[in-house]
Amino acid sequence: MKTRWLLFFFIIGIYGILKGQNLNLSNSEQALEDRWIECDLLWFKPNDIRGSVDDYFSRISPLYGNINGEKGIVLNPGWMFDMVACWTGNLDDQLILPTFSMPGHQYSSWTGKEFRELVKTIKSSASKYGFNDFKVAIWFWGGPQLYDLEKSEWKDRHPETYPVYNLRYQSPLKGDKYTYAVYPNGIPNGTPFYSFFAKQMADFSKATGIDGLEMRDFMTFRHSYEVPPHEWDEDFYQGVRSFLVELKKARPSLLCIGYNSAGPATGDLRGQGFDSYSLASNYLLDHYVIESWGVAWNDFYKPHIFSCSYAAQQAYLAVTQAQLAETKCRVLPLVELTGGWEYDDAPLTRSRFNNRMQAWLYANTFYASRAGDLSPPNGFSLAFADRARAMEKNSLISEDQVSFMKATLDRASMAAHGVEKAYGCRLFYNRNGLLWMNKNAQGVDLGEYSDFHFSFLMNLGITATSSARIEDFSKENAGDFPILFTPFQVPDKAISQIQDYTKKGGSIMIIGAKNTIDPKLKNLPNTIYWEPPLNDGKNFANPDAAEIATKINNVFKASGLSFQSTQQLGLWPMWKSKGVNYMQIVNFQYQIENAVSRVYTINISRKQLGLGSGPYHLEGVYDQRKIGADYTDKDILSFRVFVPPFESFICTLQPGEAPPENTLINNTDPRIVYKGDWKHNEMALVSFNQDEHFSANKGDYAKFTFTGSGVSVLGTKSDNLGYADIFLDGKKVYTVDGFADWSKEPSIITSAHSTNFLKDYLKYVVPEKQVLYTVSGLSKGSHTIKIVVTGTKQAEASDYGVVVDAFEVKNH
């Protein structure tokens, strides 16, 4: 279909937007959300506190603007506990900070008084920008060391804190003779670590003005994909609880910020007995950060193994929202700020599609209450404002990156807070069942991890954006298609609601082993049952998931709901906000080395979305370009969408016709004349149609004659390509420089530590397709464009090649 061509050019066309043009929001528009931004203490200077704070807000303040939720900064004082654990209580003493094993990258010396002045200056500077009640928190990672880059004095003093590498809160500390704020004469022998650290943290926050503690990666058990012995996880959870109780008792106003360590939310409870709901409902947790990694980890590490796929992280978020619903705890997914994170992940940020995609995915993941009311997450936690993790300790992320991320986050959040409908599947979380399994089924393989299986279906083209609690099941909050996981230990009222729903024609799906399904919920009408093979929680590639996804699509089709025509990997969440239907299409990949472009066929139900008759088209959210129309009056609108690997776009569904479609001519079209020794490459993964023509021989040319008002030449820029001359109707009009070294782009400059990772990532993922030349406003009639290999190149280029992928003919 022609839709394919125009959608392809939408993908190519918005590269210009992603390279610097940003959406400007009206001052009257506000994102109804919290926004916390992480920054390494390395950025701030004790000998120039005011200057470094002013520089921070001068650069980063736009990210806090137009936000009417909570605003704050989370300072990273070297990951380890040292700053607080070794706190003497004397503001004139030097604070203990971890040391780097890497020379020349050490923290400055800070006294308690200087750190207090830093906190005070941050708050006063924030108020000058109109950010009242601005919060300052610190985080700790909790391990004995990290990446072999930081060494902890606390670990040297008290290695018994880490009996099995992981922190053990209830570890009895050995007596010592050091001076501490709460024990001036040394820690008494046998003092539990949780008690000592809670008292130290309370004293430190009072003395310095710190408002919160983020328990980064030491909030939940560190084996998030395993089932530890029950006594281990019980000991860990009770230690965390005891710490929070003691901390809140000593410092009630201190914000306690949890952090889930990138593990599955069901795994925390079912596998390890970590009951975040109990903590939050007892006011021990104020915020909960979902380590959803909005670029880093998601692509580079093989996502089917490391559970870092886009779908997996969205599923984790959805389950966490259901876990913490009805509490006061604020849920904040983590999104990376382009260029700000970390040693071997900094290269992954070249494609801003990923930043945009993650922000929209997470902002528009909803929890459905008993009455069916939808609520999004409470905001974002952003990492990092500075580039210390990318080995640039004296630089902040760029103005361009700030501007881009602000526009993205604000727009996504505003769409979320006007939500009226979340289409597709709805995951029903079963807290009682997970608690029972944790206490009674330890040592059993974790095949019932609901977030894993939910993400299987999302990966395979089943639209899903929401979650709910199984005990709240009703026709009001069932959504388009309820998915129930391990439905046993379910209240009788909910069972009755489920039975009634299916008897009256509602379709549902039940996932779980036979012994995890209540007998009253077996053999229901209009129900798909799936008993997924047990797995260790690390391998996503369930062989029968595709068959199940096909069954669901068939149910959708039969029910007059939106569906995907062919079974392909990919996400396409849909929701309705302020009367507008949104769609996001993501080309998910299981393995980087097999990454390919895809064409998705998405079928949209007029009835489901409340659409009228007549033509509809997709419209890009950021450039308002009309793309791909369906001119039929059928009940189902059909759109074909081209998406490169690991990419996505966000659009709305609008009534009316699209403008005349451009025509894409692939490089294999017989109307293109090749002269010389051109090679045909059929493995060009990110090219249109996954192929291209290549030549490095001087004088070789490709010539194309067309009729239209303009034309664009699509090709590749890379580190092995040289110059080509462009001729239009016999006249030289342009010289293309095909050289590009993506590893030197500002957004992905990183240390030598990352070199091998960077090369692999660029090889498979970085989109190299470029508009090499474009012209418009041509006279009516026939025109000829010719691309000639010059046999010359930049000194840095490794070869003289020229690549031709396609020609876009403009018909208007």
Residue ranges of predicted features:
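Catalytic domains of carbohydrate-active enzymes, especially glycoside hydrolases
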Residues: 52-98, 203-213, 283, 288, ...
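Helical hinge/lid and interdomain linker segments adjacent to catalytic or ligand-binding clefts
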Residues: 444-524, 628-652
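Glycan-recognition surfaces in beta-rich domains, encompassing non-catalytic CBMs
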Residues: 657-812
